[in-house]
Amino acid sequence: MAGDVGGRSCTDSELLLHPELLSQEFLLLTLEQKNIAVETDVRVNKDSLTDLYVQHAIPLPQRDLPKNRWGKMMEKKREQHEIKNETKRSSTVDGLRKRPLIVFDGSSTSTSIKVKKTENGDNDRLKPPPQASFTSNAFRKLSNSSSSVSPLILSSNLPVNNKTEHNNNDAKQNHDLTHRKSPSGPVKSPPLSPVGTTPVKLKRAAPKEEAEAMNNLKPPQAKRKIQHVTWP
């Protein structure tokens, strides 16, 4: 059973709370189902039927209790029940607001990836990798060797004839360069070492005469005298 109230559809439960909207026949039927005796005078008048319906058949807690000892006792029980319901609602709301404390251990993960915690984890991070230390030592050795003389070690896999020709050509080029730059005196070329046993020195040392000639070409700079300031 449904109806329209003020242009709004109402369900059966809403209509039961408003007996003035119900028909007289429906009120009589509900009262008879509740086994409530209805007099003939009350059946004719709808207002009396609605009052009887509100007093006995309307759904709780809208029912008006009688003003006797039993009615007062029921009102007290109703108030206590309402207070308990309010406390329960407030407790449930507080429980929903307070979020549980989530503790993540790492062991409760469902993934297959597991991180192992080591005792010296921080120290291991600070240590350089073994390759870095090896390369640093190699760079130091190379820098020390290149600062003095850079040796060129020839591979022994090449034929001997090619090695000797290459060494002779290098010696001739060095000899020609020294004669062009310093015609005043001959320059001793470094002795050639046997092939395959010792490295060949390709770096040519600067002659002493060239250094002296370069110093002579520089104009002599007169030393400036420092003039002391004297006050009268």
Curated annotation (Swiss-Prot):
Belongs to the ashwin family. It comes from Homo sapiens. Keywords: Nucleus, Phosphoprotein. InterPro entries: Ashwin. Residues 116-127, 163-179 have a biased composition (Basic and acidic residues). The keyword Cell inner membrane does not apply. One of its GO terms (cellular component) is nucleoplasm. This is Ashwin. It is found in: Nucleus. Residues 221-232 have a biased composition (Basic residues). Component of the tRNA-splicing ligase complex. Its main location: nucleus. Pfam families: Ashwin. The modification Phosphoserine is found at residues 112, 143, 182, 184, 189, 193.
